[in-house]
Amino acid sequence: GISAPAEGESANYTITATYTDESANEIVKTINSALFRIGSIYSRKVVVEEGTGTWCGYCPRGIVGMKAMKEKHPDDFIGIAVHDDIMRVDEYIEGITPYVSGFPIAIVNRSETLDPSTPTLESQYKKEIIKPSIASVRIKKAEFGDKDSTLIRVNVSSSFAFNADRANLNFRYTFVVIENDVKGTSSDYNQTNYYADGAGGRMGGFESLPDR
């Protein structure tokens, strides 16, 4: 048998297999691989980026779904509404474009894309939350500059379920600054609503709101 590495450590293995083909030739195959043994499991977070826009009449479905998920799972559901409208951040939209086929859309942990309705989000959340988490990230302190500055200083630490120094892997932090309840005087801030007057059934209160 193969001995597993110590908990939290990694080990390299070389496996060689020899067999004889139909022409009686001896064939030797060698595989080199590494194995990590996870030492402990950290609490997993589910990050959902929602592609949305005020021009999108079906996007209230995503607004309702994201709100419901945050209320139900406040500690491990991280929802980020990524707007492609007057509130657009070009760099962010460009970053998620490879995942987007249409709006509204939910991108789950940058691996799965799906409709952001409440039942669909909940179903995918249940699949994601049981996956093992190999690291824990903690923000100790965040300092924002003055109103004219774009600088943010963040003190962050992380722990790994394996020896990250020996693993020779390239890990990076990604931070997202969000702003809630953004309002403006332009009509471009008004949400288009195809669920007005009950069209499409109940939608978290949007069925009672105007169409724009």
Q: At which residue positions do the language-model features occur?
A:
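Short, surface-exposed loop/turn segments at beta-strand-coil junctions that are enriched for proline
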Residues: 2-9, 163
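Local sequence-structure signature of Cys/Sec-based thiol-disulfide redox active-site neighborhoods
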Residues: 38-77
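Exposed beta-strand face motif in extracellular beta-rich ectodomains
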Residues: 9-15, 152, 171
